[in-house]
Amino acid sequence: MGYRKLGRTSSQRKALLRDLATDLIVHERIETTEARAKEIRKVVEKLITSGKKGDLHARRQAAAFIRHEVVEVVQVDAKGKDGSTVKKNRPVYALQKLFDDVAPRYAERQGGYTRILKKGPRRGDGAPMVIIELV
């Protein structure tokens, strides 16, 4: 099965797909061109399917592809040096969100985790724009 070159070298294309796939996992909805969205769809579907497996190998493969990006910062209780309870900020990363939040949501679903909605042409160059989102 072929793929789109997206007018870039292979390393640039891989970086673009990594960035867009990570952004889709973090925000669960992004706006991009139609060609890019169709390529991201392939990547994200495979990432979510491996996230559903949840084993160490799947986690390492996903970690090799997804950017190490902070999704949010949550406060957790932790023990201080004197034994008291203190609040600490702990970051939640994109990989953690994929395995703990996104993948379990689709446990009963056999593929088709994304939806592409056509938006219309971009004003500057007329490129067909779409919104890709997690179902």
Swiss-Prot record:
<comment type="similarity">
    <text>Belongs to the bacterial ribosomal protein bL17 family.</text>
</comment>
<dbReference type="GO" id="GO:0003735">
    <property type="term" value="F:structural constituent of ribosome"/>
</dbReference>
<comment type="subunit">
    <text>Part of the 50S ribosomal subunit. Contacts protein L32.</text>
</comment>
<dbReference type="GO" id="GO:0006412">
    <property type="term" value="P:translation"/>
</dbReference>
<dbReference type="InterPro" id="IPR047859">
    <property type="entry name" value="Ribosomal_bL17_CS"/>
</dbReference>
<keyword id="KW-0689">Ribosomal protein</keyword>
<dbReference type="GO" id="GO:0022625">
    <property type="term" value="C:cytosolic large ribosomal subunit"/>
</dbReference>
<dbReference type="InterPro" id="IPR036373">
    <property type="entry name" value="Ribosomal_bL17_sf"/>
</dbReference>
<dbReference type="InterPro" id="IPR000456">
    <property type="entry name" value="Ribosomal_bL17"/>
</dbReference>
<keyword id="KW-0687">Ribonucleoprotein</keyword>
<dbReference type="Pfam" id="PF01196">
    <property type="entry name" value="Ribosomal_L17"/>
</dbReference>
<protein>
    <recommendedName>
        <fullName>Large ribosomal subunit protein bL17</fullName>
    </recommendedName>
</protein>
